From Swiss-Prot:
Gene from which this protein is expressed: secA
Membrane topology listed for this record: Peripheral membrane protein
Composition skew (Basic and acidic residues), residue ranges: 835-847
Protein name: Protein translocase subunit SecA
GO biological process assignments: intracellular protein transmembrane transport; protein import; protein targeting; protein transport by the Sec complex
Length: 847
């Protein structure tokens, strides 16, 4: 089925869905007055009654109107914000498992309180995923005030919390956090050595804020927990960084920016061999050098400082391409990060081995119910449905959108583009109109900043180097004469309100005074009641002046690879029916045109003077064509990632379920004895041929347990060598093994035996799984070559992956038994490696 046909089918029922959502809003409106005269205590009692009714069998759907009316009243009392009807509709859509498309400024944060409260009544917890730690903390504090009136506890998961704090936060009715924190906790829980070490309590209902950013943009990025691997940092990284500098693009190697790959040419190979003093780079003994060479060229050509990463305090730190934020603790894998460190001349840190991994796609599929919100989902509706079984519904705006979206202005080269952009910003600044400028990298944001400073335009810069000021900068971005230069503003997740954001400004002011709603809620509420009205009044007065100046002007400096990201940037302006404008300033040398439509760009460049702006349908078509190519390519990649990861996901589910049973079950003696029987059976079957080689059989058996019966005793028991059958051998050896097991148990005591069994099996599972992850990654890297032999790589990956998994399970059985009989019985109460020590978290960008 084509994507366009699927989109038409998905949109066909939207009218019926909206009608149903409107009816729900009308029902809530009809009963909301019942709660206006209640005291806070009475409201809490009503909320508790709803919980009891649900536990007694009443469905959440039937109590939805009452629950939503209570939340609306609680919000009005604490925040001074009453949910609009469209917000009630959005909340109902989330409860029903939809992705609610709600434009920027429609109050998505407040919308989430409705389904969060309703679904928390089950007692199984609700997770709300935000785009960063700051918003997780801020939303949990502000929305937590609403939940508190209703008798609920609110938690938040932050990067610097210890395990006991995290466990406490997960026990709350509603827990806020980022996708990374939730995902890494899931992985760490499945590396725990006792139930007490685990922090999560299941996956019931999750609400994803900026759902497209999480499930689409970051879908290809797996969460990886790594530990240090053996071996020292190789001098080859430094050596090859120098070699890469000596090579020339186009002459010694090719670069494909679209596919993010490099290929070394014959002249380049000859140069490398000469520089290394070797005769053949591709001899088997030199195979490891090829990886060093490829990574050093990638680091040189495909990974740019202040775009893909920054160097802070002598450390290479990855910049999130979607949000512009630093991904603290993340590293590229397979030697690429070390190659970049060598290129930059900073300390080269050791490579790490994967201990646990999961993609965001498969992590969020663990939840019984999933929903999400975003300003731009309809363009990806077919992918949401096919991948996650999530329908999309577009919620109407509370007020009509009156923003003016001006045609793109295109220049021949980048320098002229930025000069004209800066002149335009100065005009807006002079008349008091606030401006938001979206750039694609730290480097570009700093270049624009220099041009504005030359023109005397006061401004703020928001990029990966100063993200700590983010809340204040965004809160003031809609004020009179405010100019804000931001990298990838699309993912910032905070409203830009004309005149300033009174809620955020109030929170910043109270925090500056040392007030914390979680530590002293009563004092905080009193201070809020005093500070908020003043700031609200001041910002509204200033908003009137901003409206007269034309509202917020949004300027894009490049078209993104996805139309959705462009729309998100535009959507920062014109919230809640406010006036506003948007315009993109482009050049024919921008990355999008250069990579994906170079022919059209070259043809136009040849006909246009340097200082002339282009506004033509041809340019628009070329841009749309380039974006369509990239969107199609990225969607296919995500689809492919999921197909391959589904193989590993089934294996991961089996291992983690098995591991969890061991943690929770306590006594695994029967399981261990089954391991012993299976291992013995496999060994005997491998030797059961026409002529028995008992010496070889006994040698193999002794690797798993101390054999107590001799070959002579076995022969005598059978009544002669000719009467020995496989069944007889099996019976005698199993009897002997059972005796050895009982002897081992009597030597160390039953309690120590149970403890030893549990720790040995967990240790072997973890080590074998770690090795299996490495082998599966190695298999996936080379599986594409099977297509040359007319074989489907995915089918081959599934088949060989299954065989490797079965082999791993066999190793787990044999090694567990071997260790059980041979390891020192004095078992430490601590695990060999504490899974709760902060891991190294990787960004696998599939390069």
């Amino acid at each position: 089925m084509s994507v366009k046909l699927l989109e038409r089918i998905l949109r066909a029922g939207e009218g019926r869905t909206l009608k149903r959502l409107r009816n729900i809003a009308h029902t809530v409106n009809a009963i909301e007055d019942e709660y206006k005269g209640c005291t806070d205590g009475e409201l809490r009692t009503f909320a508790f009654d709803l919980k009891v009714r649900h536990q007694n069998g009443e469905s959440l759907d039937s109590i939805l109107p009452e629950a939503f009316a209570m939340v609306r009243e609680a919000s009005s009392r604490t925040l001074g914000l009453r949910h609009f009807d469209v917000q009630i509709m959005g909340g109902a859509a989330l409860h029903m498992g939809y992705i609610a498309e709600m434009f920027t400024g429609e109050g998505k944060t407040l919308v989430a309180t409705l389904p969060a409260f309703l679904n928390s009544l089950s007692g199984n917890g609700v997770h709300i995923v935000t785009v960063n730690d700051y918003l997780a903390g801020y939303h949990s504090q502000q929305m937590g005030r609403v939940y508190k009136v209703l008798g609920l506890e609110t938690g938040v998961i932050l990067a610097d919390q210890d395990p006991s704090t995290r466990a406490q936060q997960y026990r709350a009715d509603i827990t806020y956090g980022t996708n990374n924190e939730f995902g890494f906790d899931y992985l760490r829980d499945n590396m725990a050595w006792s139930c007490a070490e685990r922090v999560q309590r299941g996956h019931n209902f999750v609400i994803l804020d900026e759902v497209d950013s999480i499930l689409i943009d970051e879908a290809r990025t797996p969460l990886i927990i790594s530990g240090s691997s053996s071996g020292e940092v190789s001098r080859w990284f430094v050596e090859f960084a120098g070699i890469a500098r000596a090579l020339t693009a186009g002459e010694d190697y090719d670069v494909d920016e679209r596919k993010h790959t490099v290929g070394v040419l014959e002249p380049g190979i000859a140069k490398v061999e000469d520089l290394l003093g070797i005769s053949n780079l591709y001899e088997s003994v030199n195979t490891p050098l090829i990886s060093f060479l490829n990574n050093s060229i990638k680091a040189k050509e495909l990974f740019k400082r202040d775009r893909d990463y920054v160097v802070l305090d002598g450390e290479v730190m990855i910049v999130d391409e979607h949000t512009g934020r630093i991904l603290s603790g993340r590293r590229y894998n397979e030697g690429l990060h070390q190659a970049i460190e060598a290129k930059e001349g900073v300390e080269i840190k050791a490579e790490n081995q994967t201990l646990a991994t999961v993609t965001l796609q498969n992590y969020f599929r663990l939840y019984k119910k999933i929903s999400g919100m975003t300003g731009t989902a309809v363009t990806e509706a077919s992918e949401f449905m096919s991948t996650y079984k999530l329908p999309v519904v577009s919620i109407p705006t509370n007020k009509p959108n009156i923003r003016k979206d001006h045609p793109d202005v295109v220049y021949k080269n980048e320098q002229i583009k930025f000069e004209n952009l800066a002149d335009h910003v100065r005009e807006c600044y002079t008349r008091g109109q606030p401006v938001l400028i979206g750039t694609t990298s730290v480097e570009k944001s700093e270049y624009v900043s220099k041009l504005l400073s030359k023109r005397g335009v006061r401004h703020e810069v928001l990029n990966a180097k100063n993200h700590a000021k983010e809340a204040r900068i965004v809160a003031e971005a809609g004020r009179l004469r405010a100019v804000t230069v931001a990298t990838n503003m699309a993912g910032r997740g905070t409203d830009i309100i004309l005149g300033g954001n009174p809620e955020v400004l109030t929170a910043v002011e109270l925090r500056r005074k040392g007030l914390d709603p979680s530590k002293d809620p009563e004092r905080y509420e009193q201070a809020w009641s005093s500070a908020f009205p003043k700031l609200h009044r001041r910002t509204r007065e200033e908003a009137e002046k901003v409206i007269e100046a034309g509202g917020l002007m949004v300027i894009g400096t490049e078209r993104h690879e996805s139309r959705r990201i462009d729309n998100q940037l535009r959507g920062r302006s014109g919230r809640q029916g406010d006036p506003g404008e948007s315009r993109f300033y482009l050049s024919l040398t921008d990355d999008l045109m250069r990579k994906f439509n170079p022919g059209a760009a070259s043809a136009l460049a040849a006909r246009v003077p340097d200082d002339t702006a282009i506004e033509s349908k041809l340019v628009s078509r070329a841009i749309r064509s380039a974006q369509a190519q990239v969107e199609s390519l990225n969607a296919e990649t995500r689809k492919n990632v999921l197909k391959y990861d589904d193989v590993l996901n089934r294996q991961r589910a089996a291992i983690y379920t098995d591991r969890s049973r061991i943690l929770e079950g306590g006594d695994i003696a029967d399981r261990v004895q089954a391991f012993l029987s299976d291992a013995i059976e496999e060994i005997i079957n491998s030797h059961a041929v026409t002529a028995w080689d008992f010496d070889a059989l006994w040698a193999d058996l002794k690797t798993i347990y101390p054999v107590g019966i001799s070959i002579e005793e076995l022969t005598d028991e059978a009544g002669g060598m000719g009467r020995i059958t496989p069944d007889f051998v099996m019976r005698e050896i199993l009897s002997d093994a059972k005796f050895a097991y009982e002897k081992r148990e009597s030597e160390i005591g039953p309690e120590s035996m149970r403890d030893l069994e549990r720790k040995v099996v967990l240790s072997v599972i973890d080590r074998c799984w770690r090795d299996h992850l490495y082998e599966m990654e190695y298999l996936k890297e080379g599986i594409g070559l099977r297509a040359m032999a007319q074989r489907d790589p995915l089918v081959e990956y599934q088949k060989e992956g299954f065989d490797m998994f079965e082999a791993m399970m066999g190793r787990i059985r044999e090694e567990s038994i071997g260790y059980l009989f041979n390891i020192d019985a004095q078992v430490s109460s601590n695990s060999p490696s504490d899974a709760r020590n902060r891991p190294i978290e990787h960004d696998d960008n599939a390069v």
